[in-house]
Amino acid sequence: MKLCGFDVGIDQPLFLIAGPCVIESEQLAIETAGQLKELTDALGIPFIYKSSYDKANRSSTKSFRGLGVEEGLRILQKVKDEIGVPVLTDVHEDTPLDEVASVVDVMQTPAFLVRQTNFIQNVCRQGLPVNIKKGQFQAPWDMDQVVAKAREVGNDQIMVCDRGTSFGYNTLISDMRGLASMRQTGCPVVFDATHSVQQPGGQGTTSGGQREMVPVLARAAIAAGISGVFMETHPDPENALSDGPNMWPISRLKPLLETMKELDEVVKRHGFIEDQS
């Protein structure tokens, strides 16, 4: 599959979707996009910048949601123009999809909306690549039907993304077998290494997270066989306005990316026995 000018797939080099959880300010967006571009260019990792203009799925009405669609899209356009990177953002049921599609390069659907047929198909009708997140409540093989809905409206630029599975209260678990199952959709599989360590609602009015486990799950997912990694990152996660406990610090990103790239190359050089009939 062609994505933002580069090839993605289980037989292609690992790509990265990364950026702060939410657009906090124009300055933060420009600075983080620039840092991430510099890092990924140096390592030769294809890169898409990610940040959200609105976080609809919040633990509390007091949680920061973002700058809104108009200001958020203006900033994402500026990131594209000044930094020269493709951009991704997530959309919701009340999103003006045509406005978003006029700016971004990739759309992303939230995990909690994965079974909303009209929503999934309306997003896919925009004609852009779509990263569809698997619901935390959903079996990996059930993504077959979600992909079928997307393809029914003529969109073959579909990625499927695993962000963990509910495991009791306030806890997620990552079953690496699910990544192999999701490969059977024929779509590039993306692993969300930061939301997978989230503890949803675990701090009462906000979600917690086990940031120290991000590298563990990222390495495991790459060893299992994926096309790309989704990772939210921030210069100061402790003071981030959204999802700080599970974001990875930009200052510690380079060694992690180096490990991820090397591991991906080794795994893909040997292929995947489980996919051979």
Curated annotation (Swiss-Prot):
Keywords, ordered alphabetically: Cytoplasm, Lipopolysaccharide biosynthesis, Transferase
Catalytic activity: D-arabinose 5-phosphate + phosphoenolpyruvate + H2O = 3-deoxy-alpha-D-manno-2-octulosonate-8-phosphate + phosphate
Any one GO molecular function term: 3-deoxy-8-phosphooctulonate synthase activity
Bilayer-spanning residue ranges: none
Disulphide connectivity of cysteines: none
Pfam (any one): DAHP_synth_1
Leading EC class: transferase
GO CC list: cytoplasm
Entry annotated with the keyword Cytoplasm: yes
Homology family: Belongs to the KdsA family.
NCBIfam families (alphabetical): KDO8P_synth, PRK05198.1
Protein name in the entry: 2-dehydro-3-deoxyphosphooctonate aldolase
Gene expressing this chain: kdsA
